[in-house]
Amino acid sequence: MKTLRLVLGDQLNYTHSLVYTPDADTTWLILETKDETGYVDHHIQKVIGFFAAMYNYARFLEKKGHQVIHIKINDSQNKGSLINNLSNLIQELKIEKFEYFLPDEFRLDERLKQYSNTLSIPVQVWDTEHFLAERATLGQFFEGKKEYLMESFYRMMRKRYGILMDGNGKPLGGKWNYDAENRKKWDAKKKTIPPLLFTHNFTDIALEIEKAQIKTIGSVNAAAFNWPVSRKESLELLHYFVNYLLPQFGTYQDAMSINEWSLFHSRLSFSLNTKMIHPLEVVRAALAAFEKWPEKISLSQIEGFVRQIIGWREYMRGVYWAWMPEFAGLNYFNHQRKLPVWFWNADTQ
């Protein structure tokens, strides 16, 4: 059955089970579209990073033996919007089945559901195989509760995956949370470790974004783009973090400095949010370092990091899906004024 399989820009999972089974009848589709890139003003570094990572993922799939269509933002065959591109390709290629991966955004989830309902061909939806708590698990945890306690969710995840547990159902060290030990102020005299930065010349991508008239915020040195845009680079950044930065991450995870922009943070958010690396492999790498160097990495350090990955990250996703679409319009403090211009352009002088 001739199949079109859509991969969104934040679904670049190099270890997904479907990656290992090339099918001559299935074409993977990677799209750069104006509607999905410009529905809000994204940071220019984010847009460049996504486009570069999507390009690398397309090449990866091709090397694995998959058929891939990668339509760039200014390509002549680009029909402008996600839906227009899908409809055109389904008709042009005489597609008999449409597949896509579960989106992580309510707006896009609804959009693809509605579009699928208009098709006269079968539709299959795949899990992204990324998050530790599937949507069904999230629904069971949050259903019918008046309060969504992160600590309860975090403990459930620790137990479920046996992370920092003593083997008897108890937390390692006797405590679940060492947050009280991870709130030190930054000492300006303390020596820091420089972040691992990559160097990519993406001036061509920046020019394409400008040509497409996509409105963005922020600034970028496109000739020296320093974020990871492949799984290989993401793993390099992970290993750098656990080897050099993790020993002091927890202690200063809430600290800020006007002289140091990254301190001991992993800077893995982009790699995780594009799914180039899996949260469990991130946690396992950190745990391996903790077990290897117990004299360097204290329990409070590793617990502080684990809490961010399997606690806050997974928990906030759960709250999002439990409350959407109402969640998007909540205004607890009843703020009415618009954000000032300097919030977007950083010009405070």
Outline where the language-model segments fall.
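N-terminal beta-strand-loop-alpha-helix module at the start
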Residues: 1-73
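An acidic- and aromatic-residue-enriched active-site/binding cleft used to recognize and process polar
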Residues: 10, 33, 73-76, 103-105, ...
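Short helix/loop capping segments that flank catalytic or ligand/cofactor-binding pockets
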Residues: 15-17, 38-40, 250, 280-282, ...
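Glycine-rich phosphate-binding "P-loop"
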Residues: 65-80, 341-343
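Beta-rich, aromatic/charged-enriched effector core domains that present basic-aromatic interfaces
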Residues: 81-227
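Glycine/tryptophan-enriched, flexible segments
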Residues: 161-305
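Active-site-proximal binding-pocket segments
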Residues: 267, 272, 277-349
